[in-house]
């Protein structure tokens, strides 16, 4: 794992380098849901170079309640406050639509620094993930 949201990302990078020295060949990141996470992903790519594959985590946020829960209760996940605010007052359909857009934008921002993505399905919403995969295939990947 590579926690892009670690309070002291330099320590996280040192741990990643140690993991590489001990045979690690790739990393899965925490979900990319902030500019800080993208910046740390860039720093990880620069520091670790081509020595390891990095798969950026993409987890669609589907409601304000979901975003607040992840921000406050899930260790290692940081949801940018602007994202949390955008979900205010949205119904389920609008929340899913916004979550889809946020996820596509996060993937676009992370793409230059990642070797690929791994997707986390929120609340068994398979149809949402099908839509996300289709968008990523046409808008983000080659």
Where are these regions (language model features)?
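Active-site glycine-rich loop that binds ribose-phosphate moieties when present
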Residues: 7-22
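Active-site-adjacent beta->alpha loops and helix N-cap segments on the catalytic face
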Residues: 7-11, 31-47, 124-135
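Catalytic beta/alpha-barrel core
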Residues: 25-35, 97, 118-121
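Active-site pocket-lining/capping segments in soluble small-molecule metabolic enzymes
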Residues: 1-6, 47-106, 123, 137-142
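Conserved, mostly hydrophobic/aromatic
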Residues: 19, 23, 56, 117
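Active-site capping/gating regions of soluble enzymes
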Residues: 109, 116-135, 139
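Surface-exposed cleft-lining segments at the edges of enzyme active sites
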Residues: 1-5, 24-29
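A structural motif corresponding to the C-terminal end of an alpha-helix
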Residues: 22, 105-116
């Amino acid at each position: 794992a590579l926690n892009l949201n670690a309070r002291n990302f330099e320590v996280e990078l040192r741990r990643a380098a140690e993991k590489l020295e001990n045979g690690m060949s790739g990393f899965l990141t925490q979900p990319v849901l902030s500019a800080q996470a993208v910046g740390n992903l860039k720093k990880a790519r620069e520091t670790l170079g081509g020595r390891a594959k990095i798969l950026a985590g993409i987890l669609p946020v589907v409601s304000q309640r979901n975003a607040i829960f992840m921000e406050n209760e899930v260790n290692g996940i940081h949801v940018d406050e602007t994202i949390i605010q955008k979900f205010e007052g949205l119904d389920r359909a609008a929340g899913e639509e916004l979550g889809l857009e946020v996820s596509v934008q996060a993937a676009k921002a992370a793409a230059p620094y990642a070797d690929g993505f791994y997707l986390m399905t929120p609340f068994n919403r398979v149809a949402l993930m099908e839509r996300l995969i289709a968008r990523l295939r046409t808008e983000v990947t080659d």
